[in-house]
Amino acid sequence: MIKVGIVGGTGYTGVELLRLLAVHPKVEVTLITSRAEAGKCVTELFPTLRGHYDDLYFSEPESHALGACDLVFFATPHGVAQAMMKEVLAAGVRAIDLSADFRIRDIEVWEKWYGQQHGCPELVAQAVYGLPEIHREQIKDAQLVACPGCYPTSIQLGFYPLLANDLIDPRSLIASSASGVSGAGKQAKVDLLMAEMGESFKTYAAGGHRHLPEIEQGLRDMQTPDAAEPELTFVPHLLPMIRGIHSTLFARLIENVDLQALFEDFYANEPFVDVLPQGVLPETRSVKSSNICRLAVLEPQSRGTVVVASVIDNLTKGASGQGIQNMNIMFGFDETMGLAAPALLP
């Protein structure tokens, strides 16, 4: 049994962590922080968790209290984890950061895209990028894991078999991705009102989304050594639904192979990647509240362009569920522990 703390427990990723950890047999959540809600019981804010956290109260985030944990999750906006991480790690506590603070290795690139000076650049090189399907061995011994973003997870898992086998032109990559509104967090914004985005579908951040450098860094990591630098055109969209991501990926093939067999063999031993049968395409509802990434691969009209459809739940495999998957690996638990429930339907 390990003691877990959560910094930033009132956002969507924080409450998703609470939901999933409530049934994890090897975890006790002993600390949860929120400056705004300090002193309140968790179940006062989240009645769905009654019976699981009736004695757990929000507190101010203090490093000495976090030092009593075995592991701390940061479910905070960017900029928060980097201000506290040095003290947490110095106390011998391992950490999983769900924010973007430690994902991008090039500090200048991070500062450009996130618009602020990085508060703890010396720890960036120490952080392990927490995409288990690619970095499982490094995650096992990591003190600090940077959990991938939601779009990066869906896109990297879709391109991985193709780039790792040098089967596509890395300068031809396109990702058209769509997310539910929970990916934008809980802030009150006019463009996220039901009257504004309901029954509608739109492109946003087409000129440059801050997940782009993270994705391209991850794509480079999975390539063969002599491959050209990946160039990705990434266009995100907003869907009028709460949770889920659908990424449609395109690339030019440079070698003809049995794509279906390639994907099935490549992911045969991955518990959270499901390659659908040939001719079956994934739906976001098929992964709702689950830690599964579902993939389909095809070559439409046999014209040399491979298309991959990739779906995840942005709050689960795209955030908190993947964080718990990383935790399981770090502490030697079964990787699927606490994450085996199937998707919700309807």
UniProtKB/Swiss-Prot annotation:
GO cellular component entries: cytoplasm
Classification via Gene3D superfamilies: Dihydrodipicolinate Reductase, domain 2 (3.30.360.10), NAD(P)-binding Rossmann-like Domain (3.40.50.720)
CDD domains: AGPR_1_C, AGPR_1_N
Annotated protein name in UniProt: N-acetyl-gamma-glutamyl-phosphate reductase
Cytoplasm keyword on record: yes
Organism of origin: Teredinibacter turnerae (strain ATCC 39867 / T7901)
Keywords: Amino-acid biosynthesis, Arginine biosynthesis, Cytoplasm, NADP, Oxidoreductase
GO BP, one annotated term: L-arginine biosynthetic process
Enzyme class, UniProt record, top EC level: oxidoreductase
Single annotated GO MF: NAD binding
InterPro entries: AGPR_AS, AGPR_type-1, NAD(P)-bd_dom_sf, NAGSA_dehydrogenase, Semialdehyde_DH_NAD-bd
